[in-house]
Amino acid sequence: MPPASMSLRVTILCLLAWAGLAAGDRVYIHPFHLVIHNESTCEELAKANAGKPEDPTFTPALIQAKSLPVDEKALQDQLVLVAAKLNAEDKLRAATVGMLANFLSFHIYSMHSELWGMVQGATILSPMAVFGTLASLYLGASNHTAYRLQAILGVPWKDENCTSRLDAHKVLSALQAVQGLLVAQDRAEGQTQLLLSTVVGLFTAPGLHLKQPFVQGLALYAPAVLPRSLDFSTDLDVAAEKIDRFMQAVTGWKVSSPLTGASADSNLVFNTYVHFQGKMKGFSLLAEPQEFWVDNSTSVSVPMLSGMGTFQHWSDAQDKFSVTQVPFTESACLLLIQPHYASDLDKVEGLTFQQNSLNWMNKLSPRAIHLTMPRLVLRGSYDLQDLLAQAELPTILGTELNLQKMSNNNLRVGKVLNSIFFELEADEKEPTESTQQPKGPEVLELNLNHPFLFAVYDQDATALYFLGRVANPLTTV
């Protein structure tokens, strides 16, 4: 590893260690200087706001209007270009934002998993989408709403001083950098093991005006921002169907935007859509579906992937679970966490998906493994209003939002959603060194044919991209 990269890794690990000690069970950690306004930017803001004219606005096109399709390849190329231009400070800022997203999402996940534990399906959470959505709302927020959003993002607003305020543009740019660092890996060799696309949908009532600087700022995080208008007042189910048809038409993704529970007088739905596709090197799709045991007496037939290689692995005899690290690239990996007994899934989830859970990665060691696991195609949506309430964080996404930087209209937020389309598939090219058939030691047969947990993690960026629970691969909740 080059010296500069090693220095960055050491700095990040020191920040993580310090933050873990300082944070304890609290959500909030120290506001790192890389993500807040400095004195020079505060002076520029003061000058810009002095005698500043009203921000230009526009009315989103009707959702029925013809739209150009989203070019996912172009989105990936743009992320790769972003990653190539990052300097050392940019990478450290990206790591800092990734760490903040990890802390927030572990807290949300640990509280919300109590609800998920009662559901026999598959659930998935995107730390980057959660953090990115809240940061996007912060970009459009003013006064008490901005204050409370900043606190939830992990950077308390100490006083009225500008230099303690989160810089939304820095945060959103850092989130795009985190995405770019993931998809840029292995591109030099012409390989594309990972695809990650983020699209923001801004759905408004007819006649509502959005401010152009806000929408332009969102492009720092998600290059594809789709503002559209439609009627929410007559039938929310019909409105949800229109949104879903529109998104499938422009992206090709079959995802849902559930509006159940939203008020009929809502005039804004904010949805962050994420598509992830990971190709597992040296794995192949088995010819026939295999049994997956949902519980001791119930099984379902699911497509399975199979691969053999030398993977990082650890089995905890005391708490009775195992962890296997399957590489996507040199830095990015899939972490598979399986209880020794299916009935212990909730217990193992509580042990592993928490703020200091990545400490057990130091215990992993090479092991020859023949791994069989479900081919995952997961689609799920969740409402951040529900997640924040479950996590006992301030309920700030309701009717009292101050979003003056987003619109001059009185915004009534119906839903703040994240919709995830997650795919794991086989990459049946020639096996790489880590996935070639092992020689020598006895091969461990590892079959994930009962409930398990997973995470997508980048070791260099110390960023978690997805946290998931699979109790039944055929059902997403």
From Swiss-Prot:
Domain of life (superkingdom): Eukaryota
Alphabetical UniProt keywords: Disulfide bond, Glycoprotein, Secreted, Signal, Vasoactive, Vasoconstrictor
Cystine pairings recorded for this chain: C42-C162
A Pfam family recorded for this sequence: Serpin
Keyword Disulfide bond appears in the UniProt entry: yes
Carbohydrate attachment residues: N38, N143, N161, N296
Protein's cellular compartments: Secreted
GO BP terms in the entry: positive regulation of epithelial to mesenchymal transition; regulation of apoptotic process; regulation of systemic arterial blood pressure by renin-angiotensin; vasoconstriction
PTM field: In response to low blood pressure, the enzyme renin/REN cleaves angiotensinogen to produce angiotensin-1. Angiotensin-1 is a substrate of ACE (angiotensin converting enzyme) that removes a dipeptide to yield the physiologically active peptide angiotensin-2. Angiotensin-1 and angiotensin-2 can be further processed to generate angiotensin-3, angiotensin-4. Angiotensin 1-9 is cleaved from angiotensin-1 by ACE2 and can be further processed by ACE to produce angiotensin 1-7, angiotensin 1-5 and angiotensin 1-4. The disulfide bond is labile. Angiotensinogen is present in the circulation in a near 40:60 ratio with the oxidized disulfide-bonded form, which preferentially interacts with receptor-bound renin.
Its job: Essential component of the renin-angiotensin system (RAS), a potent regulator of blood pressure, body fluid and electrolyte homeostasis.
Family assignment from sequence similarity: Belongs to the serpin family.
Name of the featured protein: Angiotensinogen
Species annotation: Callithrix jacchus
Taxonomic lineage: Eukaryota, Metazoa, Chordata, Craniata, Vertebrata
Gene: AGT
